[in-house]
Amino acid sequence: MSFYQGKKVLITGASAGIGYALAEELAQLGAEVIITARRRDRLDELAGKIENLGAKAHVFVEDLSLPESGTKLYNQIKSAGLSVDILINNAGYGRWGELTSFERDDYAKMLQLNVTTLTDLCHLYLPDMVVQGGGGIINVGSMASLSPVPYASVYSSS
């Protein structure tokens, strides 16, 4: 039996790339996945694939680059009667270019998603995991954080 069998796993940024692949793989390993991103069409497509595998998928559409979005997502998931055994903070993005070419809103949304919402979700779910007697948090990062990247100062620092 897989470690993930029966575990409820929340995956942010699940509409594409790493998050999409993680959701598929974890569902195949027996996890019940809770997927979130901005694009409902992609999440619904993924949920259909997961359900065809015989696993459960719960879809929550949320733009995690907005302030208070982590709290909103947490409350929606709780209201649906779901607990989270494993949180995978995968959502994130970067913009490249000279810092002076960005509007404040551009880098503020990047920092909100890559740092603040990630931290909010950890802060919200960690006490629940302690009460449950265990859990796990995986924060997906970028190699760009390990060394300076030209034209990506905000992304690299986040």
Regions from the language model: what does each represent?
Residues 8, 15-17:
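Conserved glycine-rich cofactor-binding loop
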Residues 100, 149-153:
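Active-site loop immediately N-terminal to the catalytic Tyr-X3-Lys motif
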Residues 98-99, 106-109:
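Substrate-binding pocket helix/loop in short-chain dehydrogenase/reductase
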Residues 90-95:
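Conserved NAD(P)H cofactor-binding loop of Rossmann-fold oxidoreductase domains
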Residues 142:
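Residue(s) in the substrate-gating loop at a strand-loop-helix junction
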Residues 29-46:
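Conserved glycine-rich Rossmann-like NAD(P)H-binding loop of the short-chain dehydrogenase/reductase
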Residues 41, 61-72, 104:
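The beta1-alpha1 cofactor-binding region of Rossmann-like NAD(H)/NADP(H)-dependent oxidoreductases
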